[in-house]
Amino acid sequence: MDKPILKCVIVDDSTLQRLSIVKLIENHPSLDLVAEYNNAIEAKLGLANNEIDLVFLDIEMPILSGFDLLDDLSHKPQIIFVTGKTKYAFKAFDYDAVDYLRKPISKERFLNA
Protein backbone atom coordinates (compact mmCIF):
# COMPACT_ATOMS: atom_id res chain seq x y z
CA MET A 1 0.00 0.00 0.00
CA ASP A 2 1.32 3.44 -0.92
CA LYS A 3 2.03 5.98 1.78
CA PRO A 4 -0.24 9.02 1.67
CA ILE A 5 1.36 12.14 0.28
CA LEU A 6 1.62 14.89 2.89
CA LYS A 7 1.14 18.49 1.81
CA CYS A 8 3.84 20.50 3.53
CA VAL A 9 5.19 24.03 3.90
CA ILE A 10 8.46 25.50 5.10
CA VAL A 11 8.57 28.50 7.44
CA ASP A 12 12.11 29.81 7.93
CA ASP A 13 13.60 33.29 7.66
CA SER A 14 16.86 31.88 6.27
CA THR A 15 16.86 31.54 2.48
CA LEU A 16 19.73 29.06 2.65
CA GLN A 17 17.90 26.84 5.14
CA ARG A 18 14.70 26.93 3.09
CA LEU A 19 16.63 25.86 -0.02
CA SER A 20 18.25 23.03 1.93
CA ILE A 21 14.87 21.76 3.15
CA VAL A 22 13.35 22.13 -0.34
CA LYS A 23 16.02 19.80 -1.76
CA LEU A 24 15.32 17.23 0.95
CA ILE A 25 11.57 17.40 0.34
CA GLU A 26 11.97 17.12 -3.44
CA ASN A 27 13.75 13.79 -2.93
CA HIS A 28 11.05 12.42 -0.63
CA PRO A 29 8.15 10.79 -2.51
CA SER A 30 5.70 11.14 0.40
CA LEU A 31 6.02 14.93 0.64
CA ASP A 32 4.46 17.58 -1.59
CA LEU A 33 5.83 21.09 -1.00
CA VAL A 34 2.93 23.53 -1.26
CA ALA A 35 4.63 26.77 -0.17
CA GLU A 36 7.63 28.42 1.43
CA TYR A 37 7.39 31.36 3.80
CA ASN A 38 10.23 33.55 5.03
CA ASN A 39 8.32 34.75 8.09
CA ALA A 40 5.57 33.61 10.42
CA ILE A 41 3.16 36.40 9.45
CA GLU A 42 3.05 35.28 5.80
CA ALA A 43 2.81 31.68 6.98
CA LYS A 44 -0.16 32.48 9.22
CA LEU A 45 -2.09 33.85 6.23
CA GLY A 46 -1.05 30.96 3.98
CA LEU A 47 -1.89 28.29 6.54
CA ALA A 48 -5.32 29.83 7.12
CA ASN A 49 -6.13 29.47 3.41
CA ASN A 50 -4.69 26.00 2.72
CA GLU A 51 -5.11 22.53 4.14
CA ILE A 52 -1.58 21.59 5.16
CA ASP A 53 -0.53 18.31 6.75
CA LEU A 54 3.02 19.13 7.85
CA VAL A 55 5.03 22.28 8.61
CA PHE A 56 8.81 22.51 8.78
CA LEU A 57 9.02 25.39 11.23
CA ASP A 58 11.89 27.56 12.41
CA ILE A 59 11.50 28.95 15.92
CA GLU A 60 13.55 32.15 16.02
CA MET A 61 12.24 34.56 13.40
CA PRO A 62 11.76 38.35 13.40
CA ILE A 63 8.48 39.79 14.70
CA LEU A 64 6.64 36.49 15.26
CA SER A 65 8.34 33.30 16.45
CA GLY A 66 7.42 29.80 15.38
CA PHE A 67 5.81 29.25 18.79
CA ASP A 68 3.78 32.47 18.40
CA LEU A 69 2.61 31.28 14.99
CA LEU A 70 1.36 28.00 16.44
CA ASP A 71 -0.40 29.83 19.27
CA ASP A 72 -2.31 31.86 16.66
CA LEU A 73 -3.44 28.94 14.49
CA SER A 74 -6.90 27.47 14.96
CA HIS A 75 -6.01 24.32 13.00
CA LYS A 76 -2.62 22.91 13.96
CA PRO A 77 -0.93 20.71 11.35
CA GLN A 78 1.85 18.31 12.29
CA ILE A 79 5.04 20.20 13.10
CA ILE A 80 8.70 19.40 12.60
CA PHE A 81 10.71 22.14 14.24
CA VAL A 82 13.90 23.14 12.42
CA THR A 83 16.29 25.24 14.48
CA GLY A 84 19.94 25.72 15.26
CA LYS A 85 19.41 25.68 19.01
CA THR A 86 18.65 22.89 21.44
CA LYS A 87 17.27 25.15 24.16
CA TYR A 88 13.75 25.00 22.68
CA ALA A 89 13.49 21.21 22.46
CA PHE A 90 11.36 20.64 25.57
CA LYS A 91 9.00 23.49 24.72
CA ALA A 92 8.70 22.19 21.15
CA PHE A 93 7.28 18.92 22.38
CA ASP A 94 4.68 20.83 24.41
CA TYR A 95 3.32 21.64 20.94
CA ASP A 96 3.14 17.92 20.07
CA ALA A 97 6.03 18.20 17.63
CA VAL A 98 6.58 15.26 15.31
CA ASP A 99 10.32 15.92 15.52
CA TYR A 100 12.98 18.51 16.27
CA LEU A 101 15.72 18.89 13.67
CA ARG A 102 18.92 20.83 14.38
CA LYS A 103 20.42 22.95 11.63
CA PRO A 104 22.23 22.06 9.49
CA ILE A 105 20.02 19.10 8.68
CA SER A 106 21.59 15.93 7.35
CA LYS A 107 19.74 13.80 4.81
CA GLU A 108 19.84 10.81 7.17
CA ARG A 109 18.33 12.78 10.05
CA PHE A 110 15.66 14.26 7.77
CA LEU A 111 14.62 10.80 6.58
CA ASN A 112 14.26 9.64 10.19
CA ALA A 113 11.95 12.52 11.12
Question: What residue ranges belong to the model's regions?
Answer:
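Non-catalytic signal-transmission and effector/linker regions of two-component phosphorelay proteins
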Residues: M1-K7
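Two-component/phosphorelay signaling modules centered on CheY-like receiver
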Residues: S14-A35, D72
